Amino acid sequence: MKSEDYSYARMAPDIHEERQYRCEECDQLFESKTELSDHQKYPCVTPHSAFSLVENSFPPSLNDDSDLTEMQHTHECKECDQVFPDMQSLEKHLLSHTEEREYKCDQCPKAFNWKSNLIRHQMSHDTGKHYECENCSKQVFTDPSNLQRHIRSQHVGARAHACSDCGKTFATSSGLKQHKHIHSSVKPFVCEVCHKSYTQFSNLCRHKRMHADCRTQIKCKDCGQMFSTTSSLNKHRRFCEGKNHFAAGGLFGQGISLPGTPAMDKASMISMNHANAGLADYFGASRHTAGLTFPTAPGFPFSFPGLFPSSLYHRPPFIPPASPVKGLPGVEQSSKSQSPHVNQPQVLPATQDILKALSKHPSVDENKALEFITESNLNQRPHEKISDHSESSDLDDVSTPSGSDLETTSGSDLESDIESDKDKLKENGKLYKDKMSPLQSLAALNSKREYNNHSVFSPCLEEQTAVTGAVNDSIKAIASIAEKYFGSTGLVGLPDKKGTTLPYPSMFPLPFFPAFSQSMYTFPDRDVRPVPLKIEPESPKETKKVQKGKTESPFDLTTKRKEEKASPNVPSKSGAPTSSNHDQPLDLSMGSRSRAATTKQTEPRKNHIFNEKKDMDPELPKTSEHCLQHARPAPFFMDPIYRVEKRKPMDPLEILKEKYLRPSPGFLFHPQFPMPDQRTWMSAIENMAEKLESFNALKPEANNLIQSVPSMFNFRASSSALPENLLRKGKERYTCRYCGKIFPRSANLTRHLRTHTGEQPYRCKYCDRSFSISSNLQRHVRNIHNKEKPFKCHLCDRCFGQQTNLDRHLKKHENGNLSGTAASSPHSEIEGTGPILDEKEDSYFNEIRNFIGNSSHNKQSPLNSDERINGSHDKIMLAGQNSDILDDDEDEAILDEDDEESDIAVKVMKEPNTSVMLEKCSVDEYEEGGKSEVNSKVSPSRYDDEDDDDDEEEDFKKSLSALDHIRHFTDSLKMRKMDDGQFNDAELSAFTASHLTDDLKHPLYRKSKSQAYAMMLSLSDQESLHPTTHTSSSMWHNLARAAAESTALHSVSHV
């Protein structure tokens, strides 16, 4: 519509060239076909008036001068003197003059709004740059590219550029120029990895796509993950934007606190930094500041750490920091003032009075004091909020778990926490009395309250059912994998409770597995259970009874440790660092470095909060069992692969399921963020598989275990056994519907489908042979019919059709396959056995020639022997050369390594040719050798003339005994007369095989040739003229002789 309202001067610049139409009579140029037709209505010598067009277009009633003049002035443009038939057309035209035209032509009064239009218009004034179309001379172009585009689109077609070498056509000259690189020997595009060169850049790109090792690797600057393309890197960077991604600061800006998000100081970070040093080195450390994390990952398989690339899904700590709850002011102050390297006893100000009273009266009921502290903690909830990010330290690679709903904590959660605390105190109340002083007990419970409150949320039904059946089937396998892979990467050889070394290395020290109450995991049963508000004391005996009577909880390590003490023979995997006072309750503020340290280094850090008080009470009874001070829901890392520490070797599968099957992590995922798609978690699984693959190189003894694991991931499987979407990464579009094979391009699939359908659309015009690929047809015509062999070998003057075949031929010269008499071997070029076998064969033929030449001294035998052996040798050499030529010609037919049809065709061609050639060489050799030998041996004159050589000839004749008995089976008694030299022509006539039937004649004749060949081998063994070569060729002789003897036995049994 715009083109109708505005002239071309008002339009945006056109990418196509402005077409011009020339008048054949006056050579005047016109911008449109209509202007040219209007011009041709009148003679070119008398230029017509613009009003004549209007006059011609109006009816005759307007022919009077007054009306015509009025009409002319009414419909004439005053700016450009154009005349229009009606007022409406004139008004439309006048719109083009409303804006100022900046660009005016210096050769004509035309002006343009766009500079590009002015430049294109000025080219029309230059008569030297006019390009006319040969087919339609009326069209003139100012740019030769526009003329070529016009010819392709209007006259010739889409593929006007033909290759002079192969006849292939192309749509553009650039395509033809690029194609001509194929016919040259220059290969400028080289792979940087394997140094393979190509004539075209597209072939190099395809090579890199097909070979994963040669792909260009682009490294992510944030996490170090490698990618082959920039597009895949850009997609990855959406999920990996730096260390603050998925954190509160990363999602909502630096320094902005989420509602209810507590700050984490160094002390809190120390308490939750339990990352094993060896494990961190293996999975890669992602150093992030503290803050809430919202990983958008499902419950399985993302509960496995290491599935995600570093910084892709930031892993929360094994044991979380001060839980996402508004803690006591005293707790915040103490954590602020505490240094990670200084051990100071901290006393909570909120409990000063109680602690003083307890210090004065140690006999006060400690459980009541604990209850009082609990109630006071519940009533003191500060509302201040602190910054999300703590100071930078060497422990800043820990991120906190998500899902803290601080403002909407219900009373049932608090009651459940109280209930769990009661259960813990019932089970371990006596242990607290024996273990610590009242002051320590109060401080421990206060810290415990800080962790427990508001940290457990009931998951929804979907999250509870997120773990699939495949998880249950893989629990045992995952436990084995974790034990095998990570057993030596943690604290190796940690002593157990009794001070002895563990039977197998432990992956984590004891504090990695806090004591969990069963009520923490039975979320549906929480609301129906009573909520106790009083904590009743219980005797140690009752506690022990309860512990023995309870079924072992998969997360309650307290009962586990109690059981371990009762039965020390059971292997323990708790692996707690022991010392002279290892029974002291562990403080979970210990960092990973101190946990990986020795026993002496661990002791002061382990109880740095209570160490002074402990020194003040040296007479406290010590027990070997205790419970950890923080009961909380299943953390992010409490999954089967890390819970192998509790595994017994003989546990049945159902018990393992109860132990290692992680409940649905309801608190892990924030409700505001959706679950990831399949591509995200498949990428995570792939990352885990790659890490396990690389880790296996350090532990090769794990191969047998992993290969037998029936895991759903099949970690140790080959690359072909992995899912295709992990290997192809988006190239599943071109899949064969017959065999399921996947191709990176549609052209490859089309070519492959012809192998199933048998379609061969390309037919040779000379021999009517059909091909499924056009390149095979071109190669066939070039090599077979045209005999084009421009590439010549400078060593043997052989010619080849392509440079690649010449290069292959030159390599044979370098390896020595074509040097000396190596071509004399009937198998040298066909089987490609190498130069060593050629030397053996060459020595074998030399021995036969030398033996015959030295053993034959009469007038006939030297001539016959030389002619026989040399003749057969020449024929063998000729056959070997022909096989070499044929092999090279066939090699020329194998140019494209991706050409499936040509590979199959060459295999089919090579096999019959090889067998036929071997048979032909054997037949020629046996005919030349066998016939002449028999004829020369049975000649009576030979034995009558010379008696000196009787001994040698007798041996020679004995070697023919098997042949003679087969060839002349009915006259075997007469054959023995050869020893006495009594032969005549009548007896010789009886030696013919005319009396044999045709069924026996052919197989016996063929077997006789094999026996003659075996005879020559035996002769070469009897008199070796080259000791150096005889030893090297002994194996070759034995093999050939054994084959000949087996055929002789077979032929005798057949007769």
UniProtKB/Swiss-Prot annotation:
Residues 381-392, 531-566, 602-621 have a biased composition (Basic and acidic residues). Induction: By retinoic acid (RA) signaling. Repressed by wt1 and by notch signaling. A motif (CTBP-binding motif 1) lies at residues 554-558. Expressed dynamically during embryonic development; in the developing pronephros, specific areas of the brain (forebrain, midbrain and hindbrain), and in the majority of the visceral arch, and head mesenchyme derived from neural crest cells. Within the pronephros, expressed in the ventroposterior region of the pronephros anlagen from stage 20 (and is absent from the splanchnic layer that forms the glomus), then expression becomes restricted to the distal tubule and duct by the tadpole stage. In adults, expressed in various tissues including kidney, lung, testis, spleen and stomach. GO terms for cellular component: nuclear speck; nucleus. SUPFAM superfamilies: beta-beta-alpha zinc fingers. It holds the Pfam family zf-C2H2. Keywords: Developmental protein, DNA-binding, Metal-binding, Nucleus, Repeat, Repressor, Transcription, Transcription regulation, Zinc, Zinc-finger. One of its GO terms (biological process) is pronephric duct development. One of its GO terms (molecular function) is zinc ion binding. A motif (CTBP-binding motif 2) lies at residues 585-589. Residues 944-954 have a biased composition (Acidic residues). A motif (Nuclear localization signal) lies at residues 422-435. Residues 324-345, 372-423, 531-621, 813-837, 922-957 are annotated as: Disordered. A zinc finger (C2H2-type) spans 21-48, 75-97, 103-125, 131-155, 161-183, 189-211, 218-240, 734-756, 762-785, 791-813. Residues 332-345, 399-413, 569-583, 591-601, 816-827 have a biased composition (Polar residues). It is found in: Nucleus; Nucleus speckle. Gene3D superfamilies: Classic Zinc Finger. Homooligomer. Interacts with ctbp. The CTBP-binding motifs and the N-terminal group of zinc fingers are required for repressor activity in the pronephros. Transcriptional repressor during pronephros development. Plays a role in regionalization of the pronephros; may promote formation of the distal tubule and duct over formation of the glomus and proximal tubule. This is MDS1 and EVI1 complex locus protein EVI1-A. It comes from Xenopus laevis (African clawed frog).
